[in-house]
Amino acid sequence: MISKIITSIFGSSNDRTLKRLRKRVAQINKLEPAFEKLTDEELQAKTAEFKQRLADGASLDSLLHEAFATVREASRRVMGMRHFDVQLIGGMVLTNRNIAEMRTGEGKTLTATLPCYLNALTGKGVHVVTVNDYLARRDAETNRPLFEFLGLSVAVNVPGLPNEVKREAYKADITYSTNSELGFDYLRDNLAHAKEDRFQRELHYALVDEVDSILIDEARTPLIISGPAEDATQIYQAIDTIIPHLVQQDKEDTEEYTGEGDFTLDLKNKQAHLTERGMVKVEGILTEMGLMQEGETLYHPARIALLHHVYAALRAHKLFELNVDYIVKDGEVVIIDEHTGRTMAGRRWSDGLHQAIEAKEKVNIQGENQTVASITYQNYFRLYEKLAGMTGTADTEAFEFQQIYGLDTIVIPTNKPVIRDDRTDLMFKSEPEKFAAIIKDIQECMARQQPVLVGTASVEKSELLSAELTKAGIAHNVLNAKFHAQEAEIVAEAGAPGAVTIATNMAGRGTDIVLGGNWKAEIAKLENPTEEQIEAIKAAWKERYDIVMKAGGLHIIGTERHESRRIDNQLRGRSGRQGDPGSSRFYLSLDDALMRIYLNEGKLNMMRKAFSEEGEAMESKLLTKVIASAQAKVEAHNFDGRKNLLQYDDVANEQRKAIYEQRNYLLETEDISAMIETIRGDVFNRVIDQFIPPQSIEEMWDVAGLEEALKRQFGMELPIQHWLEQENDLHEETLRERIIDIATQEYHAKEEKVGSEVMRNFEKGVMLQNLDELWKEHLSAMDYLRKGIHLRGYAQKDPKQEYKKESFEMFTNMLDLLKSNVISVLSRIQVRSQEEIEEAQRQQEAMAQAESENYRTADHQAEAQQSESLTEEQLANLDIGRNDPCPCGSGKKYKHCHGSKARYA
């Protein structure tokens, strides 16, 4: 009550903002006469003038009045449309980090041209985000003449574009795209193995259309790129046959002891290691199998992957036991939880271990599907330097927009007053009674030729109501979300006299329902229409328009209340555009989901008794308020859920940003040798610390353990014990320095053999490959941690704090492992010529290429796109030039597609 009194005296925050912006509109209007006098060339020259002023230090805000006046005048000349004052207000709101709530039909597409032009002047790129491909293409083509007249480039980015076309689209001043494609391209960029393979520039300014749909409804939709692991079924099966020929040895070889076995086991850490004797035996068998060439070793750069498979098979046979660690059920290997003894269906061991066990048990070897990159819309759009959005319904979620995204919501007044008649809800006892009342309402509307749009909460309810209308002999259209272009066409015609259209609540957003039908669409269907044809179509439309206006405009019927008031408001907002007449009513029943969920059985029974006759309707403003109150509670609950989940996502998001920043540094930097030197020192110091603690006396040293660790991890055989016996002045620091110096010298000797340029490229390749592999495993581990962390609450611990703490430990451990793996590979690599290291590089590139081709996007909104493809055999029989387009239809050059596969076959 007090807040209402204060608002009535001082005005709301929204009112004060609008008052301030109206003063700026007056300034823009004052410029209009002068801009009308400019020639086309003078008007077009304004763009270059504004860019120069920005380069000279002017701010965007200082250019706003003139820039908006320029766009308005250009729009009048090019498109025949002049921006209303309220559209100028909307444009100013969208220039900064705000959301503009603009009612349906108020011209959001035209309003968007103002902030897009202003922000594009920076040269950093503007992204206009839509909910589907059709709207992205439509809006781009609608506004393209205006932007190109003003000297700005426009492009569309949708799924399926060839890489070069997509890359050019992101270079445009203004790029129209869908939210999902922007997110996937961001992830693809952070999987690229060369900087020239990336698509996006720095994320500068995004203008999100239907912002509530993307940033609220789909906020938790994860964009996931997953890649099947390399299909190595035959290799797993071949190597599985080697293991029975190997003999276990009790302990590892040392200077004093050389065993007769082929491998040793570390039962504590469940690891296996080949002895020198075992290495030679395995290499011999692999050579006989044709998997290796004569004279090659398993540490040859091109054969490291084989060694990985051998160790996986050893562990599978010697360290993992049937009915103890796993069971075989229905032809699948199912892991047994070591703590609970329960099976964990769907879980798989990584690093090829699961496939090795499948080979051991002679069951089908499944490919590994692994998440290689993921991000939520919440976290993706928060990466933009400037973010703005527009929608017809945002005010109910204003608090969430502010809390999560830091965006203020400004309600923009309509150009003409809304005269739609929003009638009170009608409540019925059962769904059949409700449907009967809806059909009666539709029949009455059809009798006076009033168009009707019926909104349903689900496809199932749409089909149910459609069947009832068919029984009643009522012709109608049903919308589904499968074909966006046709959907928009049907919605555009939904305003024709007597038209009946059933749609799910969200269907057709972004397309206006024009009373009388869409005359522009009729003209567009004609090839080279004459003036007479155009005038005839307009005249026929005017007659239909008058009929619909007389009938009361578009009538909206809601078949039930949605959990969110915003969705209901969106449905209502389809009617009464730009001062047109219209009406709306919601029909409810006690069988509706909202009533069943939020009213207990006692209250429902009481309400059922209140209905005395079949078909009787209960109408009450109090009932409408009660339902609105229930909806507000649901919205608050959903917001708390999204906010809670975001707090968990933020932890992974910070780690993702750190990894991607490091990855981009690797791609941008030609020489990372200084980084490798630093990492080498860190890794060797950490290994030495395990056996020779800092500031310790010699009696505390485990010299034999250090010698073995250096040999196992880095392939270095150093006589440390002999040094200590011969040199009395050798202490901890000097010993540490000597070991690192020898490692560095050995590495530099390899570099001299192959050349520094080749070694630099190889270092980057090893670093990127290990970073990507460990990041994939880390994502899986984080997912497992997230799923079980809530159980910490039973131990009186805060799950969020525990998650932050453990995920940070996992992240630092991953970084330590990354350093160790990189230095281990670089230290153990055996090179005798430049050709060998280049072959290893080519294998890395081939693996990266194969991965990028195998990545699949998993998005619950994405539609399956089927295309005919040529078989490998057909491709092999074609005479194709290396630089010709690949005939598979990928859009890539043959050498980068199936030509690449043939090369590495």
Swiss-Prot record:
Superkingdom of origin organism: Bacteria
CDD domains cross-referenced by the UniProt entry: DEXDc_SecA, SF2_C_secA
SUPFAM superfamilies associated with the record: Helical scaffold and wing domains of SecA, P-loop containing nucleoside triphosphate hydrolases, Pre-protein crosslinking domain of SecA
EC number(s) given by UniProt: 7.4.2.8
Residue positions binding Zn(2+): 886, 888, 897-898
Quaternary structure (record): Monomer and homodimer. Part of the essential Sec protein translocation apparatus which comprises SecA, SecYEG and auxiliary proteins SecDF-YajC and YidC.
Name of the protein in question: Protein translocase subunit SecA
Start-end of Basic residues biased regions: 892-905
Keyword annotations: ATP-binding, Cell inner membrane, Cell membrane, Cytoplasm, Membrane, Metal-binding, Nucleotide-binding, Protein transport, Translocase, Translocation, Transport, Zinc
Biased composition (Basic and acidic residues): 853-862
Record text on cofactor binding: May bind 1 zinc ion per subunit.
Functional note: Part of the Sec protein translocase complex. Interacts with the SecYEG preprotein conducting channel. Has a central role in coupling the hydrolysis of ATP to the transfer of proteins into and across the cell membrane, serving both as a receptor for the preprotein-SecB complex and as an ATP-driven molecular motor driving the stepwise translocation of polypeptide chains across the membrane.
Residue spans of biased composition, Low complexity class: 843-852
Membrane topology: Peripheral membrane protein
Record GO biological process: intracellular protein transmembrane transport; protein import; protein targeting; protein transport by the Sec complex
Family: Belongs to the SecA family.
Skewed-composition ranges (Polar residues): 863-874
Residues the record lists as binding ATP: 87, 105-109, 512
Cofactor: Zn(2+)
Enzyme class (EC, first level): translocase
Species of origin: Actinobacillus pleuropneumoniae serotype 5b (strain L20)
One of the record's GO cellular component terms: cell envelope Sec protein transport complex
Cell compartments where the protein resides: Cell inner membrane; Cytoplasm
GO MF assignments: ATP binding; metal ion binding; protein-exporting ATPase activity
